[in-house]
């Protein structure tokens, strides 16, 4: 019986040690994109500070601060600006037309979980309000004219 207990504990300890070694967190490593990508960010947002880069799929994404706002700026492999995502602290920071559009929608009583403004080079700005009610979750896209996109 003692042999079985020792063997069981040995397996538990080995699995625990393996689990911790497999959870290597590489947050300390800095990703550096190609020079044309960093130059594109400097051209678009010359005052960007505290820039941290990562890859999301095929896109280079700069997490940075510009005039007090935290932005995620997306570029393709050719250093073309794809979009900028600005996460807002509150729904109250939305432009009044979008705020009113949301308040007049069927989702106004739902819990707001996140609010973003998406800016594109060739398309109108969109506001995204993520809401939940119970197990249901939706991302509501509002056009610049306050209309809920279908």
Segments from the language model and where they lie:
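Bacterial N-terminal signal peptides that target proteins for export
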Residues: 1-10
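Hydrophobic helical h-region of N-terminal Sec-dependent signal peptides
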Residues: 9-17
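C-terminal motif of bacterial Sec signal peptides marking the signal peptidase cleavage site
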Residues: 18-22
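Bacterial signal peptide processing site
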Residues: 24-27
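First exposed extracellular module after export/assembly in secreted or surface-exposed proteins
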Residues: 30-150
């Amino acid at each position: 019986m003692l042999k079985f207990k020792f063997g069981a504990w040995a397996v538990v300890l080995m699995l625990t040690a393996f689990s911790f070694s497999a959870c290597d967190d590489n947050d300390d490593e800095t990703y550096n994109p190609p020079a044309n990508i960093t130059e594109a960010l400097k051209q678009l947002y010359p005052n960007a500070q505290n820039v941290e880069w990562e890859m999301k799929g095929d896109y280079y994404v700069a997490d940075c601060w510009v005039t007090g706002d935290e932005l995620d700026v997306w570029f393709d492999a050719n250093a073309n600006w794809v979009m900028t995502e600005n996460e807002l602290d509150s729904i109250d920071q939305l432009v009044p037309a979008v705020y009113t559009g949301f308040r007049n929608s069927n989702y106004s009583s739902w819990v707001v979980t996140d609010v973003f403004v998406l800016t594109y080079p060739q398309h109108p700005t969109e506001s995204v309000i993520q809401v939940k009610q119970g197990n249901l979750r939706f991302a509501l896209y509002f056009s610049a004219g306050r209309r809920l996109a279908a």
